């Protein structure tokens, strides 16, 4: 009986140590992923957009990209860029 209880307590201790290791690894991975997302976001903010992308709000100063056209779409209360059924040339 003592051996069975000792085995169960030992198994619980091993599981606790393993789960602590997984949590630490998961937290480090989460922090690394968050840092990567912030880097990508900062890089995209520095690029100047020449045109509005799909479903972006459009008006005269900011035209839609070449393969999009500015249209009024109900129930949206402003103009958005929608596909004009052409493909951009690369």
Curated annotation (Swiss-Prot):
Disulfide bridge positions per record: 51-65, 58-70, 64-81
Cross-referenced InterPro entries: Huwentoxin-1
Signal sequence interval, chain numbering: 1-19
Propeptide position ranges: 20-50
Localisation per UniProt entry: Secreted
GO molecular function: ion channel inhibitor activity; toxin activity
GO CC annotations on file: extracellular region
Keywords: Disulfide bond, Ion channel impairing toxin, Knottin, Secreted, Signal, Toxin
Expression sites by tissue: Expressed by the venom gland.
Keyword Chloroplast: no
Major localisation: secreted
Pfam families associated with the record: Toxin_12
UniProt note: domains: The presence of a 'disulfide through disulfide knot' structurally defines this protein as a knottin.
Protein family according to the UniProt entry: Belongs to the neurotoxin 10 (Hwtx-1) family. 13 (Hntx-13) subfamily.
Role summary: Ion channel inhibitor.
Protein name: U7-theraphotoxin-Hhn1l
The organism of origin for this protein: Cyriopagopus hainanus
């Amino acid at each position: 009986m003592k051996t069975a209880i000792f085995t169960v307590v030992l198994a619980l201790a091993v599981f606790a140590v393993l789960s602590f290791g997984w949590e630490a690894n998961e937290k480090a991975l989460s922090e690394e992923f968050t840092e990567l997302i912030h880097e990508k976001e900062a890089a995209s903010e520095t690029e100047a957009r020449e045109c509005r992308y799909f479903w972006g709000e459009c008006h005269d100063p900011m035209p839609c990209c070449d393969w999009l056209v500015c249209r009024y779409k109900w129930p949206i209360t402003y103009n958005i860029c929608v596909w004009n059924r052409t493909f951009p040339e690369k």
